[in-house]
Each structure stands twice: as C-alpha cells, then as structure tokens.
Amino acid sequence: MGVQKDSRDIRWNRTTRPLALLLCGLLAFSALSCARTLPEGRKANLAELVSEEEEHFLLDPGNALRLFCDTNQTTIVNWYTESTRLQHGGRIRLTDTVLEIADVTYEDSGLYLCVVPGTGHILRNFTISVVDSLASGDDDDEDHGREDSAGDMGEDPPYSTSYRAPFWSQPQRMDKKLYAVPAGNTVKFRCPSAGNPTPGIRWLKNGREFGGEHRIGGIRLRHQHWSLVMESVVPSDRGNYTCLVENKFGSISYSYLLDVLERSPHRPILQAGLPANTTAMLGSDVQFFCKVYSDAQPHIQWLKHIEVNGSRYGPDGVPFVQVLKTADINSSEVEVLYLHNVSFEDAGEYTCLAGNSIGLSYQSAWLTVLPEEDFAKEAEGPETRYTDIIIYTSGSLALLMAAVIVVLCRMQLPPTKTHLEPATVHKLSRFPLMRQFSLESSSSGKSSTSLVRVTRLSSSCTPMLPGVLEFDLPLDSKWEFPRERLVLGKPLGEGCFGQVVRAEAYGINKDQPDKAITVAIKIVKDKGTDKELSDLISEMELMKLMGKHKNIINLLGVCTQDGPLYMIVEYASKGNLREFLRARRPPSPDYTFDMTKVPEEQLSFQDLVSCSYQVARGMAYLESKRCIHRDLAARNVLVTGENVMKIADFGLARGVHDIDYYKKTSNGRLPVKWMAPEALFDRVYTHQSDVWSFGVLTWEIFTLGGSPYPGIPVEELFKLLREGHRMDKPSNCTHELYMLMRECWHAAPSQRPTFKQLVETLDRILATVAEEYLDLSMPFEQYSPACEDTTSTCSSDDSVFTHEPDVPSLFTHHTTTSMVGT
C-alpha cells in the first residue's frame, strides 16, 4: 500500500488508530479477525467504515491523486468513497490495485476505501483533504471571514494515539519576515501548523497579547487558516507580530515585522533626465521613457508639441500639443512611448505629463531625426565632437578670465555715485504647458489651464479694492472675464486673509450677454502671505480641472489681468446647509410669533432625504474625479434659492501631514467630530474617510442642524471612537436611514459604502417616501449645544472643533449672510 505524490508536492501526515466498532466474539467466529467486511452488492456507509489503519493526505486543487492498495490476496480491488463505489471513467482511472484521480477539486475530499471483491474485507482507508493553501488567508475563502473557536482546535482528535508537538506544516509560506505596506492596505500573517493534539494559536504584538481590542477596525483571527488579518492598516499598526502555537507537548513561535508607510501628499515625481533627448535614423524605431513616482494614483499623458498655422503657441501664449497616449499607472507600459518608423515630421519636442489629485509634473525631451548618412557620421565622429567641445570650452574659459580681469580693474577705480531710477516691472517669462489632462483618465481632458508662475505687481498699481493682494498670471482665455463687467456688492464673509464679495456679473452667461447674474467672488487680501496666494491659485486651478456638476459650487470665471485675482463662483442665496436647517426647525413650546420675521418654509421628510441624496451625488462626482474633500460637513454645503445642494471648499489645499491633532491652543480649529478615526488618529485621508463625514452630515440633516456628539467633550470623543461608540438614531430618521449612517461609520474603511452606492440607496429611498412633514413636537434642542459652535468662548463640552497650532486659514469667516466656499 502506498501513495504516489504529484510533482506539485502533496503534503501529508500519517496516524495509526485502532478501531473496534464491531462486536467480535459474540458468535462462534470469535477466533476470526476483527476486520470489517463489506458485502458485495451493498453500498458502503461512511458511518460504518472500519479500518485498522488510516492515512491522511493534504492536496492542493489541481493535484493528481494516486492511491495504492497492495495486497497478497488478490490483484483486483474495489474502491469506495462515501456511499458510492467508484467506476472507471472521466477523471477516475482504476488499474488493478491503483486508484488515480486527475485534477482533484474540493468535492474530491473525503474517505476512500479499497475492498477485496467477494469477501468485502476493507484492506485500507485513506482520508483525502483538498485545501487551497495559497488562498488560505484570503478574504474570499468559503467561510467568508468566519472566525473559528480557538478552543475547538485544542481538542484531541478521536481515536488518536500518536502524539506530536507543534510543527510548521508549510514553512515555505513563512519566508517573508518584513512587511512594508502603504497605509490603507490589508495585511495577512500566516503560521500554518500541525500537531497532535491539534495545537492552539495565539498572537502577540511587541511581546504582549494581541486581540485587536484597541485597533480601529479590529482584526480577524482565522484559526482554521492559522492567520491574522488586519484591514486598512495605519502607521500605529507598526510593530512585531508573533504567532505562538502550542499544545501540551510543546510550543513554537514565529515573528513578523510590519512597517506601515504613510501616504505622501505630493504631486508625482519624475526621475531626472527622463525622457532624454534622442537622435534617431530615418525609418528606425524610438522609445521615450518617463519614470513616475507617486503614492496617490497617477495618470500619465504623452504629448507632442505641434504647429498650427506656422505657430507653436496660441494667442494666449499656450502651446499647441497633440495627445499621443493617455493612461493610468496600471495600464501596460504607460511610462514608455513607442514611435515606429520615424519620419522627419516626427522630429520635435515630446512631453511626459503626470498628475494626481495633488498636482501635476512634466518633463520634456527632443527627438532629432537624421538621414542614414548623417546618422552614420554622427555615430562615427566622436573625435570631432570632442575637439569642438575642447575649443568651445577653452573659448568660454578665456572669456570668463577676461571678465574677471575687467571686474578687478573696475574695483581699483574710485567709486562714483549714480542716480537710481525706479525699476520697471516686467512680466516673468514662463512656460504655460497646456493641460489637456483630467483627474480621471476617462475624461475628455479638454481643459486648457496653464501651469503658472506668479509674480507680484509693482506697488504703484492701484487695485480696484483697497488692501487686496495683486500679482501677475498668464492669460487663460477660456476662463478670463472682463473686470469692467463686474459690479461689486457687499461682503458676504471676511477672515484673516481672504474675503468673499457678492457681485453682479454682466454677460457671464454667454447666451445672455446683457443680463446680470449674481455671483460670489473670492479675493485674497493684501496682508496674505505667498502661501495664501498660492492656495487660492491652486484652488482655482483645481476647479478648472473639475468640470461642472449641479451639486458642487462651480467656477464661472477668473480675473487675472491688470489687478487683483478674482475667482468668480456660483452664488448660493440661502447660505450654508447647517444654518438653512436650523432656520427651519419647528418652533419650541415657548415660541413667540414675530410679525416682522417671515417664517421659513416647512421641511418634509422627503426634503431631508433629498438633501442627503444631492450631497451624495456631488460627492460621487468628486470621487469620480479622484478629489478627496477632507472637510465634508453641513457648514460646507451651500443652498441655492431653488434648494439645490452645492458642495463647497473641495478645492482648498489642506496640509494634513503638518497637523498635531491632539494639541490644543487658542488658535486654529479642526473639525474632529466629522473626521473618520483613521484621519483623526493616523492622518490617512481617503474617499472612505469622506464617506464617514457624509454619515455625520446625514445625521446633521435629520437633526435639522444638530451638533454631532452633543454633550461629549472632544477629549472623551477620542476614547469613545476607539471603543466603537456611535451616535444614536435621530428622532425623525427611519431605521433604514440610520443603518445607512452606521454603514458609513464602519470602523474598517473598506467596509463602508462608496458614494456611488450611497446615491443608489438614497435614490431608492427617495422614490418610496411620501411627503410627510416632520413632527412639530420633536425637541430638536437636544441636538444643540448650550452655546454656538462658532464662538471662541464655547466650552469644549459641545465644541465641534479641537484646536491646532497657529496655522492661518485662507477663508475663516465671521457671521455671514451667504457663504461660498468659506
């Protein structure tokens, strides 16, 4: 008897166990062997199978199984599995005393017996287990992540008499000791083991018992696969993880080192010198290489600079380019541009343009195409080139020495006073590369935004508004709007470095050139630093790339020439969503009617669902453009006169890696009550962290502008979030909607719904709800703090913010009538 192992390394172990399930000796045949017989013509019953010896084999799916049942009694045996006799055919091949099964599957697992025909004697039995060891720790196992009981693993196997201390059953799966992964990835540690009795497994982190109680998102201990699974790892998960496998005959251990790399909030980095200038022979093939390093998902375009009507640049100074190749980093050979059978027309400048949600980077190279004879001379004449280099270098050194001599001679002369004339300010030379590029690789990429270099204007210029910062930017004809067609109105909000002004724009709607439309204008004040100016320009550039959507604040135009920078955006007459909801709360019992105040319209349950649905649509659009908001809250959603929800401030630059989230000072505030745990504790911002904030925003909507976590101090909030506490269901919210909020607040980011899924769910709910108005008796005051969140004197008990060091905010407003992106 034996087993022939396939070349793919069948792992097996063998145990012997006596079986005494039949009563022998009750009849006169007590001297006969206690071997179990299986009468011919009767199917084997698994519960009745008896053997003196069992062999257990572990196979991977796809292996070939080959069992031998050697016997001196006969040259032919019958094979049984479960309650079925095996027949020759298909994957099964029977030859004398040999059973062969090709390409085993999970269904082939079970008990196999070889039986002597006629007598029914069971000669041998085999237990076959088909297990996919390569996927033993993956999420798509058949148990779907179900956890086993650790106690079950330590029980003695029935009828076992062969004992053994724990040992590694698959050491080849444990070669990798160091795991260095970016934040947000899933990590699996495996320690596949065996022993008799079956050993138990424990996990230690840095030498201490580890059960994941204090980890955001918890862990999964998959005992049947001897694995530890951690989803959405963060920097605080770094450390040494040790598996301790033990039974009463011994113990073994193995350690893994986990290093979680923080995501880098930088635009793509291009390797210096690539692409490189290339000289090619006519008709040959050319390759340009562009090595891109980016933590955020990058998108890459290859551009060729072309001429239109004999000019390389348009009237606005932007070069004409042709997009040759567009792809993201996962595409095949995206960093290589192939040019086949090049001609003289292919000669020119080529640019590799790479971008992510943070910004853009580009590098260019020239292709020179030569006839075969010229290319041969170029290749054969290095000595001539070296001679030219020596001549030019010598000449340059001679000129440099002459210049030094002249300077030294002038220094010997007595100084003379000269009258200094006021310097004339000239525009800086620039290279405004056309951005035929979008944050999403599938977009049309028609934006012609320029890569700009900023310079301040002379102080002799007179700004249209006093105290407003001025500068020089290249003209972008697609977005430029004439200043003389703007009539500035009253300020809508003002902060330390910026202000928002209401204005009337004549002709900004090209279909109605003489009609005035109310808009909002963002301006940087004169005392703003270069960083505030740069932030506003970055916001403007990003809004150009984002395109237009009904549920976001859209860019309408810019004024960049002959004066301060104006960023013209849509105007929302009803202010931010938080104040919009609070103004429409039902009156309290002690309410006194005010004849001078016009009552606001009453909101129905359908209206509130519509608010959430519209915000989800806007966020789904931003997600499709790979834009992470990072500060989604009701205060950053604006409401138009037609009750259309518009997300604001998605273009603001936020340096999340430079913030101490635990330090409180008197200056600067952070919206901790809207932040996902991974963003709050580990500074990891993703679309999933925006989904968490959307859940809090939905809670705000159904409490009509309530303050999240009412009555809970910020310091206590940190502890409650780590322990898994969540806000209760609002009074006017259905169970289905509350469960949707709870899904948004799942501790594991990967388990939260996407904005696309949220849109689909809310669309379905919106289609089924009736216009039922809210119960006027519900006490909405329970969701309001004793003092307003926006006042600096409010205690930390109900403040929605925690403080950070003094980092100026571009648009930090006081009270406003209507705010746009502030």
UniProtKB/Swiss-Prot annotation:
ATP binds at L492, G493, E494, G495, C496, F497, G498, Q499, V500, K522. Residues 486-774 form the Protein kinase domain. Pfam families: I-set, Ig_3, PK_Tyr_Ser-Thr. This is Fibroblast growth factor receptor 4. Its EC number is 2.7.10.1. Glycans are attached at N13, N72, N125, N240, N277, N309, N330, N341. The modification Phosphotyrosine is found at Y661, Y662, Y773. Residues 1-35 form the signal peptide. The gene is FGFR4. Gene3D superfamilies: Immunoglobulins, Phosphorylase Kinase, domain 1, Transferase(Phosphotransferase) domain 1. The lineage of its organism: Eukaryota, Metazoa, Chordata, Craniata, Vertebrata. GO terms for cellular component: endoplasmic reticulum; endosome; plasma membrane; receptor complex. Residues 39-129, 157-259, 268-368 form the Ig-like C2-type domain. PANTHER family: FIBROBLAST GROWTH FACTOR RECEPTOR 4, TYROSINE-PROTEIN KINASE RECEPTOR. Belongs to the protein kinase superfamily. Tyr protein kinase family. Fibroblast growth factor receptor subfamily. It comes from the Eukaryota. Residues 410-822 are cytoplasmic. Keywords: ATP-binding, Cell membrane, Disulfide bond, Endoplasmic reticulum, Endosome, Glycoprotein, Immunoglobulin domain, Kinase, Membrane, Nucleotide-binding, Phosphoprotein, Receptor, Repeat, Signal, Transferase, Transmembrane, Transmembrane helix, Tyrosine-protein kinase, Ubl conjugation. PROSITE patterns: IG_LIKE (PS50835), PROTEIN_KINASE_ATP (PS00107), PROTEIN_KINASE_DOM (PS50011), PROTEIN_KINASE_TYR (PS00109). InterPro entries: FGF_rcpt_fam (IPR016248), Ig-like_dom (IPR007110), Ig-like_dom_sf (IPR036179), Ig-like_fold (IPR013783), Ig_I-set (IPR013098), Ig_sub (IPR003599), Ig_sub2 (IPR003598), Kinase-like_dom_sf (IPR011009). Disulfide bonds join C69-C114, C191-C243, C290-C352. It is a single-pass type I membrane protein. It comes from Pleurodeles waltl. Residues 36-388 are extracellular. Residues 136-166 are annotated as: Disordered. It is an enzyme of class 2 (transferase). One of its GO terms (molecular function) is fibroblast growth factor binding. It catalyses: L-tyrosyl-[protein] + ATP = O-phospho-L-tyrosyl-[protein] + ADP + H(+).
